[in-house]
């Protein structure tokens, strides 16, 4: 008959587990007693309640025996300061704005530019508000005169837009033979810029900040250069880029900018190292070709 030997350490461990289990049971019982302490007190007498509590009616409300008008007044007395959801005009507006937000997110996922999406969404929201929230007829005449003057001033400025577009589309081909970036056609002026245009320019430059572009060197070869090597603030680069013909207009449309042309122009003005490496005549031709190609679209 074989003998079974038990390790003393296993016995001690088992005893320790039993002690811990007993302590756990005692702790659980104590917590249960504490949580049910309020049930061990004397029951509350109804007569001992405050006077206001006696008015509380637990039974179901009886149907109104009075005329209809009186019942409606009593039931709706507490709701005088609240508007029904069906009569609130801002609930449809909120749902419309939620729908517009979902559409904006979907368009951004497809790769469209944010500022282009936002401008279209703003126009749709303005038209929705104009249709569903018309101006009341009791408006003052001062507001109407202000709106009339604005509407009259807009048609006067519209004929100038085709002229600007014609100027932007014409690039001086003869300037390709001259040397240096100043030979660019600066007659093609940019449109009036705003914060959204600057943000679009900064966004595209920041995306390609470390990308290297090819430039013609003095040794009849090429060298690589990027925006990081300028060691300039992004705001300063954007300020210089806005002076290049067509950049502001393309940024306003949310389309791709001639980044190599922008880099070449800024570097040829602010980077001594770039000036020593680049062939000015060929650089001017490269920049002019970029502008012609981008303005053609």
Curated annotation (Swiss-Prot):
Post-translational modification (record): Phosphorylated by host PKC and by an unknown kinase.
Record motif Nuclear export signal, residues: 49-58
Sequence ranges of Polar residues compositional bias: 143-161, 169-179
Region Disordered, residue ranges: 140-189
GO MF, any single term: RNA-directed RNA polymerase activity
Source domain of life: Viruses
InterPro entries cross-referenced by the UniProt entry: PP_M1-like (IPR004259), PP_M1_C (IPR037199), RABV_P-like_C (IPR049506)
Keyword terms: Chaperone, Host cytoplasm, Host nucleus, Host-virus interaction, Inhibition of host innate immune response by virus, Inhibition of host interferon signaling pathway by virus, Inhibition of host STAT1 by virus, Inhibition of host STAT2 by virus, Interferon antiviral system evasion, Phosphoprotein, Viral immunoevasion, Viral RNA replication, Virion
SUPFAM superfamilies hit by this protein: Phosphoprotein M1, C-terminal domain
Transmembrane segments: none
Motif (Nuclear localization signal) on chain: 211-214
GO biological process entries: symbiont-mediated suppression of host innate immune response; symbiont-mediated suppression of host JAK-STAT cascade via inhibition of STAT1 activity; symbiont-mediated suppression of host JAK-STAT cascade via inhibition of STAT2 activity; symbiont-mediated suppression of host type I interferon-mediated signaling pathway; viral transcription
Any GO CC annotation of this UniProt entry: host cell nucleus
Phosphoserine modified-residue sites: 210, 271
Subunit structure: Homotrimer when phosphorylated. This trimer is stabilized by binding to the L protein. Binds soluble protein N, and ribonucleocapsid. Interacts with host STAT1, STAT2 and PML.
Function: Non catalytic polymerase cofactor and regulatory protein that plays a role in viral transcription and replication. Stabilizes the RNA polymerase L to the N-RNA template and binds the soluble protein N, preventing it from encapsidating non-genomic RNA. Also inhibits host IFN-alpha and IFN-beta signaling by binding and retaining phosphorylated STAT1 in the cytoplasm or by inhibiting the DNA binding of STAT1 in the nucleus.
Protein name: Phosphoprotein
């Amino acid at each position: 008959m074989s003998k079974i030997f038990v390790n003393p350490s296993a016995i001690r461990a088992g005893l320790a587990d039993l002690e811990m289990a007993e302590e756990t049971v005692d702790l659980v019982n104590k917590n249960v007693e504490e949580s049910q302490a309020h049930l061990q007190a004397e029951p509350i007498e109804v007569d001992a309640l405050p006077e206001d509590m006696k008015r509380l009616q637990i039974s179901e409300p009886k149907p109104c025996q009075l005329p209809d008008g009186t019942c409606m007044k009593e039931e709706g007395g507490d709701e005088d300061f609240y508007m029904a959801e069906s009569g609130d005009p801002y609930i449809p507006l909120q749902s419309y704005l939620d729908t517009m937000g979902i559409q904006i997110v979907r368009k951004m996922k497809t790769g469209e530019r944010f500022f282009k999406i936002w401008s279209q969404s703003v126009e749709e929201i303005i038209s929705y508000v104009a249709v569903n929230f018309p101006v009341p007829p009791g408006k003052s005449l001062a507001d109407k005169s202000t709106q009339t003057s604005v509407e009259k001033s807009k048609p006067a400025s519209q004929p100038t837009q085709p002229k600007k577009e014609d100027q932007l589309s014409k690039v001086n081909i003869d300037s390709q033979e001259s040397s240096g970036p100043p030979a660019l056609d600066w007659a093609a002026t940019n449109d009036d810029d705003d914060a959204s245009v600057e943000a679009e320019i900064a966004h595209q430059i920041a995306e390609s900040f470390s990308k290297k572009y090819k430039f013609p060197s003095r040794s009849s070869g090429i060298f690589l250069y990027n925006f990081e090597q300028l060691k300039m603030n992004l705001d300063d680069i954007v300020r210089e880029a806005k002076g290049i013909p067509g950049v502001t207009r393309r940024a306003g449309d949310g389309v791709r900018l001639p980044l190599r042309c922008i880099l070449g122009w800024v570097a040829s003005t602010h980077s001594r190292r770039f000036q020593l490496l680049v062939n000015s005549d060929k650089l001017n031709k490269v920049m002019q070709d970029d502008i012609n190609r981008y303005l053609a679209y």
